[in-house]
Amino acid sequence: MKLSKKGEYALRSLINLGIAAEMKRKLVQVSELAESEQLPVKFLEQILQALKEAGIVESQRGKFGGYRLGRPANTIFIGEVVRLIDGPLAPIGCVSQTAYEPCTCPDEAHCGLRMLMVDVRNAIAGILDRYTLADVVEITLRKMRRDSISLPFSAQVAGARPRARVPARLAREQLALRVRSTRKGRTSPTEGVLHHILGEYSI
């Protein structure tokens, strides 16, 4: 499985909408979402429309309109979003649980390749179907706070000057430098970065 650009942008936008909700922002404009992650606006609008049709986000029109999550973040599973945008998680059709397609193998039940790909599918699904958007938002905010990164999408008080935000790319570079400077060891591939968000590890 390879996440497409469309799938990547969908997840990044949802994470930002989740962060905005935690920051008590009611709505986020498409242009703001695009700017925060340096994404093309027109392409992002198409992705948000697909998410809206699935009920994952909702929008409000008007001068002060924008997007917000259509469901609680703890009910939006990452695997659901990936399947919606990119299709089945399975690397080959004959092991898919949601879009099965017979393969050309004459003996599917005893096909070694299929057995291997079942394990691959289960490993991918086991991670993407375990975590919700709320989980990813939580660890993102925890790590940003730990590394003193300016939090995006803070609710603005009327009349107050908006706080300057660090551009997404620069923030990621600063974060990488902090992590490398304090790293003591690497996370085991079987443990997962999400479980070690407060530890010292390399992303």
What are these regions (language model features)?
Residues 48-49:
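Short, hydrophobic-biased segments on the C-terminal half of alpha helices
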